[in-house]
Amino acid sequence: MNSKIAYIMSRFPHLSETFILREMNELERHGWQIALYPLILQKQPVVHAEAERWIPRARYVPFFSAEVLSANARALLKPHRYAALWGRTLWENRNCPNFLARAMVLLPKAFQMARLMEQEGITHIHAHYATHPALVAWLIHRLTGISYSITVHAHDIFVRTAMLGTKLRDATFIAAISEFNREYLANLIGPSVRDKTHIIHCGVVPSTYQSRLRLPKEGERFEIINVGSLQPYKGHPYLIQACAILHQRGIRLRCRIIGGGSQDSLNQMIVQAGLEGIVELMGPQPQHEVARLLSTSHCYVQPSIITPSGKMEGIPVAIMEAMASGLPVVATSISGIPELVRPEQTGYLVPPADPTALADQLAKVYTDPIHANQLAQAGSALVRQEFELSSNVERLATLFEQL
Protein backbone atom coordinates (compact mmCIF):
# COMPACT_ATOMS: atom_id res chain seq x y z
CA MET A 1 0.00 0.00 0.00
CA ASN A 2 1.30 3.47 -0.92
CA SER A 3 1.90 6.15 1.69
CA LYS A 4 -0.88 8.34 3.03
CA ILE A 5 -1.09 11.80 1.48
CA ALA A 6 -3.04 14.68 3.02
CA TYR A 7 -4.63 17.03 0.49
CA ILE A 8 -5.21 20.59 1.70
CA MET A 9 -7.52 22.85 -0.29
CA SER A 10 -9.20 26.13 0.61
CA ARG A 11 -12.79 24.96 0.44
CA PHE A 12 -14.73 21.83 -0.38
CA PRO A 13 -16.85 21.03 -2.25
CA HIS A 14 -16.09 23.73 -4.80
CA LEU A 15 -17.64 23.49 -8.26
CA SER A 16 -14.88 25.38 -10.07
CA GLU A 17 -12.13 23.13 -8.64
CA THR A 18 -13.28 19.84 -10.12
CA PHE A 19 -9.72 19.26 -11.32
CA ILE A 20 -8.54 18.69 -7.72
CA LEU A 21 -11.34 16.19 -7.16
CA ARG A 22 -10.35 14.31 -10.32
CA GLU A 23 -6.73 14.24 -9.20
CA MET A 24 -7.59 12.77 -5.79
CA ASN A 25 -9.83 10.14 -7.36
CA GLU A 26 -7.16 9.14 -9.85
CA LEU A 27 -4.50 8.85 -7.14
CA GLU A 28 -6.80 6.54 -5.18
CA ARG A 29 -7.27 4.43 -8.31
CA HIS A 30 -3.48 4.12 -8.40
CA GLY A 31 -3.47 2.80 -4.82
CA TRP A 32 -2.64 5.95 -2.87
CA GLN A 33 -4.40 6.71 0.40
CA ILE A 34 -5.75 10.25 0.26
CA ALA A 35 -6.98 12.19 3.30
CA LEU A 36 -8.83 15.41 2.49
CA TYR A 37 -8.30 18.39 4.82
CA PRO A 38 -10.35 21.37 3.55
CA LEU A 39 -9.86 24.68 5.32
CA ILE A 40 -13.57 25.41 4.81
CA LEU A 41 -16.29 22.78 4.46
CA GLN A 42 -19.07 24.53 2.59
CA LYS A 43 -22.53 23.84 1.22
CA GLN A 44 -23.21 24.51 -2.45
CA PRO A 45 -26.46 24.39 -4.42
CA VAL A 46 -24.77 22.34 -7.15
CA VAL A 47 -22.35 19.54 -6.21
CA HIS A 48 -20.66 17.15 -8.62
CA ALA A 49 -21.66 13.54 -8.06
CA GLU A 50 -17.99 12.59 -7.65
CA ALA A 51 -17.69 15.01 -4.73
CA GLU A 52 -20.51 13.43 -2.73
CA ARG A 53 -18.44 10.52 -1.43
CA TRP A 54 -15.69 12.84 -0.24
CA ILE A 55 -17.89 15.07 1.91
CA PRO A 56 -18.26 12.60 4.84
CA ARG A 57 -14.55 11.74 4.55
CA ALA A 58 -13.32 15.32 4.84
CA ARG A 59 -11.23 15.99 7.97
CA TYR A 60 -12.57 19.43 8.68
CA VAL A 61 -11.22 21.31 11.69
CA PRO A 62 -13.41 24.23 12.86
CA PHE A 63 -11.69 27.56 13.28
CA PHE A 64 -12.45 27.57 17.00
CA SER A 65 -13.26 24.54 19.15
CA ALA A 66 -12.21 22.81 22.34
CA GLU A 67 -9.86 20.64 20.27
CA VAL A 68 -8.21 23.69 18.70
CA LEU A 69 -7.74 25.28 22.14
CA SER A 70 -6.29 22.03 23.47
CA ALA A 71 -3.86 21.72 20.56
CA ASN A 72 -2.65 25.27 21.10
CA ALA A 73 -2.26 24.66 24.83
CA ARG A 74 -0.08 21.63 24.05
CA ALA A 75 1.94 23.68 21.56
CA LEU A 76 2.59 26.28 24.26
CA LEU A 77 4.62 23.66 26.12
CA LYS A 78 7.29 24.66 23.59
CA PRO A 79 6.85 28.43 23.90
CA HIS A 80 9.83 29.45 21.79
CA ARG A 81 8.66 27.43 18.79
CA TYR A 82 5.07 28.61 19.27
CA ALA A 83 6.10 32.26 19.41
CA ALA A 84 8.49 31.85 16.48
CA LEU A 85 5.76 30.45 14.23
CA TRP A 86 3.37 33.23 15.12
CA GLY A 87 6.05 35.87 14.75
CA ARG A 88 7.36 34.73 11.39
CA THR A 89 3.88 34.21 9.93
CA LEU A 90 2.62 37.61 11.02
CA TRP A 91 5.81 39.35 9.93
CA GLU A 92 5.84 37.83 6.44
CA ASN A 93 2.17 38.70 5.90
CA ARG A 94 2.44 42.20 7.35
CA ASN A 95 2.14 44.00 3.99
CA CYS A 96 -1.12 42.27 3.04
CA PRO A 97 -3.91 43.06 5.53
CA ASN A 98 -6.26 40.40 4.15
CA PHE A 99 -3.63 37.68 4.35
CA LEU A 100 -2.53 38.85 7.77
CA ALA A 101 -6.08 38.59 9.12
CA ARG A 102 -6.61 35.15 7.59
CA ALA A 103 -3.25 33.92 8.84
CA MET A 104 -4.27 34.86 12.38
CA VAL A 105 -7.43 32.77 11.95
CA LEU A 106 -5.69 29.81 10.31
CA LEU A 107 -2.74 29.55 12.70
CA PRO A 108 -4.68 28.19 15.70
CA LYS A 109 -6.44 25.49 13.66
CA ALA A 110 -3.15 24.50 12.00
CA PHE A 111 -1.94 23.19 15.37
CA GLN A 112 -4.95 20.87 15.58
CA MET A 113 -4.60 19.81 11.95
CA ALA A 114 -0.97 18.93 12.65
CA ARG A 115 -2.05 16.85 15.63
CA LEU A 116 -4.64 14.96 13.56
CA MET A 117 -2.20 14.30 10.73
CA GLU A 118 0.35 12.83 13.11
CA GLN A 119 -2.33 10.61 14.65
CA GLU A 120 -3.48 9.49 11.20
CA GLY A 121 0.01 8.63 10.02
CA ILE A 122 0.18 11.18 7.22
CA THR A 123 3.56 10.95 5.48
CA HIS A 124 3.25 13.89 3.08
CA ILE A 125 1.02 16.92 2.49
CA HIS A 126 0.02 18.26 -0.91
CA ALA A 127 -1.52 21.75 -1.04
CA HIS A 128 -3.43 23.09 -4.01
CA TYR A 129 -2.73 26.82 -4.37
CA ALA A 130 0.21 28.66 -2.85
CA THR A 131 -2.03 30.87 -0.71
CA HIS A 132 -3.75 29.66 2.49
CA PRO A 133 -3.47 25.89 1.78
CA ALA A 134 0.29 26.26 1.32
CA LEU A 135 0.55 28.38 4.47
CA VAL A 136 -1.14 25.67 6.53
CA ALA A 137 1.04 22.99 4.91
CA TRP A 138 4.14 25.03 5.79
CA LEU A 139 2.97 25.48 9.40
CA ILE A 140 2.30 21.75 9.81
CA HIS A 141 5.69 20.98 8.29
CA ARG A 142 7.37 23.27 10.83
CA LEU A 143 5.44 21.65 13.67
CA THR A 144 5.79 17.99 12.69
CA GLY A 145 8.49 17.64 10.06
CA ILE A 146 5.97 16.17 7.60
CA SER A 147 7.10 17.14 4.10
CA TYR A 148 4.84 19.07 1.76
CA SER A 149 4.47 20.04 -1.88
CA ILE A 150 2.37 22.64 -3.68
CA THR A 151 0.49 22.87 -6.96
CA VAL A 152 0.59 26.48 -8.14
CA HIS A 153 -2.14 27.78 -10.42
CA ALA A 154 -2.73 31.48 -11.14
CA HIS A 155 -3.85 34.15 -8.65
CA ASP A 156 -1.85 32.38 -5.94
CA ILE A 157 1.41 33.39 -7.63
CA PHE A 158 0.45 36.34 -9.84
CA VAL A 159 -1.38 38.49 -7.27
CA ARG A 160 -1.44 37.03 -3.76
CA THR A 161 2.26 36.65 -3.08
CA ALA A 162 2.51 37.16 0.69
CA MET A 163 5.09 34.72 2.10
CA LEU A 164 5.33 33.06 -1.32
CA GLY A 165 9.11 32.67 -1.34
CA THR A 166 9.18 30.96 2.06
CA LYS A 167 6.40 28.54 1.18
CA LEU A 168 7.99 27.59 -2.15
CA ARG A 169 11.58 27.29 -0.91
CA ASP A 170 10.60 25.00 1.98
CA ALA A 171 8.43 22.74 -0.21
CA THR A 172 9.88 19.39 -1.26
CA PHE A 173 8.69 20.04 -4.81
CA ILE A 174 6.39 22.35 -6.73
CA ALA A 175 3.90 21.28 -9.38
CA ALA A 176 3.18 24.00 -11.95
CA ILE A 177 0.25 23.71 -14.32
CA SER A 178 2.18 25.42 -17.14
CA GLU A 179 5.67 26.21 -18.35
CA PHE A 180 4.67 29.87 -18.09
CA ASN A 181 4.19 29.43 -14.35
CA ARG A 182 7.54 27.72 -13.90
CA GLU A 183 9.43 30.50 -15.66
CA TYR A 184 7.42 33.15 -13.85
CA LEU A 185 8.36 31.68 -10.47
CA ALA A 186 12.01 31.30 -11.45
CA ASN A 187 12.15 34.98 -12.39
CA LEU A 188 10.25 36.03 -9.26
CA ILE A 189 11.86 33.83 -6.58
CA GLY A 190 15.10 32.60 -8.13
CA PRO A 191 16.55 29.81 -10.29
CA SER A 192 16.55 27.31 -7.40
CA VAL A 193 12.76 27.21 -7.64
CA ARG A 194 12.92 26.19 -11.31
CA ASP A 195 14.99 23.12 -10.46
CA LYS A 196 12.30 21.64 -8.21
CA THR A 197 9.28 22.76 -10.24
CA HIS A 198 7.65 20.11 -12.40
CA ILE A 199 4.96 20.57 -15.05
CA ILE A 200 1.85 18.70 -13.94
CA HIS A 201 -1.18 19.76 -15.93
CA CYS A 202 -4.68 19.74 -14.47
CA GLY A 203 -5.83 16.96 -16.73
CA VAL A 204 -9.18 15.81 -18.05
CA VAL A 205 -10.67 12.44 -18.97
CA PRO A 206 -11.27 12.76 -22.74
CA SER A 207 -13.68 9.80 -22.84
CA THR A 208 -16.07 11.86 -20.68
CA TYR A 209 -16.76 14.09 -23.67
CA GLN A 210 -18.36 13.42 -27.05
CA SER A 211 -15.76 14.32 -29.65
CA ARG A 212 -17.46 14.59 -33.02
CA LEU A 213 -17.51 16.87 -36.04
CA ARG A 214 -20.07 19.68 -35.72
CA LEU A 215 -20.10 22.07 -38.67
CA PRO A 216 -22.68 24.88 -38.59
CA LYS A 217 -24.78 24.63 -41.74
CA GLU A 218 -25.50 27.71 -43.81
CA GLY A 219 -28.12 29.80 -42.04
CA GLU A 220 -27.98 27.63 -38.91
CA ARG A 221 -27.66 29.36 -35.57
CA PHE A 222 -24.02 29.62 -34.50
CA GLU A 223 -23.72 28.00 -31.06
CA ILE A 224 -21.00 29.58 -28.92
CA ILE A 225 -20.21 28.43 -25.39
CA ASN A 226 -18.04 29.55 -22.49
CA VAL A 227 -17.48 27.90 -19.10
CA GLY A 228 -16.05 29.81 -16.17
CA SER A 229 -16.93 31.58 -12.95
CA LEU A 230 -18.23 35.12 -13.44
CA GLN A 231 -15.10 36.88 -12.22
CA PRO A 232 -13.52 39.98 -13.81
CA TYR A 233 -10.43 38.18 -15.13
CA LYS A 234 -12.64 35.81 -17.14
CA GLY A 235 -13.46 38.70 -19.50
CA HIS A 236 -17.17 38.04 -19.98
CA PRO A 237 -18.03 41.68 -20.82
CA TYR A 238 -15.79 41.46 -23.90
CA LEU A 239 -17.52 38.27 -25.00
CA ILE A 240 -20.90 39.98 -24.71
CA GLN A 241 -19.59 42.94 -26.72
CA ALA A 242 -18.25 40.55 -29.38
CA CYS A 243 -21.66 38.87 -29.57
CA ALA A 244 -23.26 42.29 -30.09
CA ILE A 245 -20.88 42.95 -33.00
CA LEU A 246 -21.70 39.57 -34.59
CA HIS A 247 -25.42 40.21 -34.12
CA GLN A 248 -25.08 43.61 -35.80
CA ARG A 249 -23.33 41.90 -38.73
CA GLY A 250 -26.34 39.68 -39.21
CA ILE A 251 -24.87 36.44 -37.86
CA ARG A 252 -27.52 34.38 -36.14
CA LEU A 253 -26.03 33.10 -32.91
CA ARG A 254 -26.54 31.96 -29.35
CA CYS A 255 -23.89 32.29 -26.65
CA ARG A 256 -24.27 30.23 -23.49
CA ILE A 257 -22.15 31.22 -20.49
CA ILE A 258 -21.89 28.61 -17.72
CA GLY A 259 -20.58 29.58 -14.31
CA GLY A 260 -21.45 30.86 -10.87
CA GLY A 261 -21.16 34.42 -9.63
CA SER A 262 -22.95 37.74 -9.72
CA GLN A 263 -24.93 38.18 -12.93
CA ASP A 264 -26.30 41.70 -12.40
CA SER A 265 -23.81 43.74 -14.43
CA LEU A 266 -23.63 41.15 -17.21
CA ASN A 267 -27.42 40.96 -17.44
CA GLN A 268 -27.51 44.74 -17.70
CA MET A 269 -25.03 44.60 -20.59
CA ILE A 270 -27.11 41.94 -22.33
CA VAL A 271 -30.28 44.02 -22.08
CA GLN A 272 -28.57 47.24 -23.20
CA ALA A 273 -27.11 45.46 -26.24
CA GLY A 274 -30.47 43.91 -27.14
CA LEU A 275 -29.10 40.40 -26.73
CA GLU A 276 -31.90 38.88 -24.63
CA GLY A 277 -32.40 35.31 -25.82
CA ILE A 278 -29.06 35.45 -27.63
CA VAL A 279 -26.61 35.54 -24.71
CA GLU A 280 -27.73 33.25 -21.89
CA LEU A 281 -26.24 33.19 -18.38
CA MET A 282 -26.85 29.63 -17.26
CA GLY A 283 -25.31 29.73 -13.78
CA PRO A 284 -23.29 26.85 -12.30
CA GLN A 285 -23.88 23.41 -13.81
CA PRO A 286 -22.78 19.88 -12.80
CA GLN A 287 -20.07 18.26 -14.86
CA HIS A 288 -22.34 15.94 -16.83
CA GLU A 289 -24.46 18.91 -17.93
CA VAL A 290 -21.36 20.86 -18.96
CA ALA A 291 -20.30 17.90 -21.11
CA ARG A 292 -23.77 17.73 -22.69
CA LEU A 293 -23.83 21.44 -23.48
CA LEU A 294 -20.36 21.27 -25.02
CA SER A 295 -21.60 18.48 -27.28
CA THR A 296 -24.34 20.74 -28.68
CA SER A 297 -22.04 23.70 -29.46
CA HIS A 298 -20.02 24.80 -32.50
CA CYS A 299 -17.28 26.88 -30.88
CA TYR A 300 -15.74 27.48 -27.46
CA VAL A 301 -14.59 30.97 -26.42
CA GLN A 302 -12.19 31.93 -23.61
CA PRO A 303 -12.15 35.77 -23.46
CA SER A 304 -9.93 36.04 -20.37
CA ILE A 305 -8.00 39.21 -19.52
CA ILE A 306 -5.34 40.47 -17.13
CA THR A 307 -7.00 42.68 -14.52
CA PRO A 308 -5.40 45.92 -13.25
CA SER A 309 -4.31 44.02 -10.11
CA GLY A 310 -2.53 41.43 -12.29
CA LYS A 311 -5.03 38.62 -11.83
CA MET A 312 -5.19 36.23 -14.78
CA GLU A 313 -5.69 32.63 -15.81
CA GLY A 314 -3.31 29.71 -15.47
CA ILE A 315 -4.52 27.31 -18.17
CA PRO A 316 -8.32 27.02 -17.97
CA VAL A 317 -9.43 23.40 -17.62
CA ALA A 318 -12.57 24.38 -19.53
CA ILE A 319 -10.46 24.81 -22.68
CA MET A 320 -9.21 21.23 -22.28
CA GLU A 321 -12.79 20.03 -21.88
CA ALA A 322 -13.84 21.93 -25.00
CA MET A 323 -10.98 20.50 -27.02
CA ALA A 324 -11.76 17.00 -25.76
CA SER A 325 -15.29 17.63 -27.03
CA GLY A 326 -13.94 18.39 -30.50
CA LEU A 327 -14.74 22.11 -30.45
CA PRO A 328 -12.75 24.84 -32.19
CA VAL A 329 -11.38 27.22 -29.55
CA VAL A 330 -10.96 30.98 -29.69
CA ALA A 331 -9.01 32.32 -26.70
CA THR A 332 -6.92 35.27 -25.61
CA SER A 333 -3.13 35.17 -25.70
CA ILE A 334 -2.29 35.46 -22.00
CA SER A 335 -0.39 33.41 -19.40
CA GLY A 336 -0.20 29.68 -20.18
CA ILE A 337 -3.09 29.58 -22.66
CA PRO A 338 -0.81 29.53 -25.76
CA GLU A 339 0.71 26.26 -24.50
CA LEU A 340 -2.68 24.67 -25.18
CA VAL A 341 -4.24 26.94 -27.80
CA ARG A 342 -1.40 27.08 -30.30
CA PRO A 343 -2.23 29.67 -32.97
CA GLU A 344 -3.28 28.16 -36.29
CA GLN A 345 -2.31 24.72 -34.97
CA THR A 346 -4.82 23.80 -32.27
CA GLY A 347 -6.96 26.94 -32.12
CA TYR A 348 -7.14 30.69 -32.49
CA LEU A 349 -5.63 33.41 -30.30
CA VAL A 350 -6.69 37.05 -30.10
CA PRO A 351 -5.47 39.96 -27.95
CA PRO A 352 -7.18 40.28 -24.56
CA ALA A 353 -9.82 42.98 -23.97
CA ASP A 354 -10.44 43.42 -27.71
CA PRO A 355 -14.08 42.60 -28.56
CA THR A 356 -13.65 43.50 -32.24
CA ALA A 357 -10.75 41.07 -32.69
CA LEU A 358 -12.76 38.44 -30.83
CA ALA A 359 -15.80 39.01 -33.05
CA ASP A 360 -13.67 38.92 -36.21
CA GLN A 361 -12.15 35.57 -35.25
CA LEU A 362 -15.52 34.07 -34.30
CA ALA A 363 -16.87 35.20 -37.66
CA LYS A 364 -14.00 33.35 -39.39
CA VAL A 365 -14.85 30.18 -37.46
CA TYR A 366 -18.46 30.57 -38.60
CA THR A 367 -17.63 31.22 -42.26
CA ASP A 368 -14.82 28.64 -42.54
CA PRO A 369 -15.94 25.76 -40.32
CA ILE A 370 -13.90 23.17 -42.21
CA HIS A 371 -10.61 24.86 -41.29
CA ALA A 372 -11.87 25.47 -37.76
CA ASN A 373 -12.61 21.81 -37.31
CA GLN A 374 -9.19 20.81 -38.64
CA LEU A 375 -7.68 22.82 -35.81
CA ALA A 376 -10.23 21.34 -33.42
CA GLN A 377 -9.10 17.82 -34.30
CA ALA A 378 -5.48 18.82 -33.64
CA GLY A 379 -6.54 20.35 -30.33
CA SER A 380 -8.35 17.18 -29.34
CA ALA A 381 -5.23 15.15 -30.13
CA LEU A 382 -3.05 17.51 -28.07
CA VAL A 383 -5.32 17.14 -25.03
CA ARG A 384 -5.08 13.36 -25.31
CA GLN A 385 -1.29 13.52 -25.61
CA GLU A 386 -0.37 16.09 -22.95
CA PHE A 387 -3.41 17.00 -20.84
CA GLU A 388 -4.95 13.63 -20.12
CA LEU A 389 -5.65 13.12 -16.41
CA SER A 390 -4.10 9.70 -15.90
CA SER A 391 -0.70 10.50 -17.41
CA ASN A 392 -0.38 13.74 -15.43
CA VAL A 393 -1.39 12.04 -12.19
CA GLU A 394 1.19 9.35 -12.89
CA ARG A 395 3.85 12.07 -13.05
CA LEU A 396 2.62 13.46 -9.74
CA ALA A 397 2.58 9.98 -8.19
CA THR A 398 6.17 9.44 -9.33
CA LEU A 399 7.17 12.56 -7.40
CA PHE A 400 5.37 11.26 -4.32
CA GLU A 401 7.19 7.93 -4.65
CA GLN A 402 10.56 9.70 -4.70
CA LEU A 403 10.00 11.38 -1.32
Regions found by a protein language model. Give the residues of each.
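A conserved mid-protein helix/loop that constitutes part of the nucleotide-sugar donor-binding site
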Residues: 18, 222, 226-245, 264, ...
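Nucleotide-activated donor-binding/catalytic signature segment of Leloir-type glycosyltransferases, i.e.
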Residues: 267-288
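Short hydrophobic beta-strand element within catalytic cores of glycosyltransferases
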Residues: 319, 324, 328-331, 341
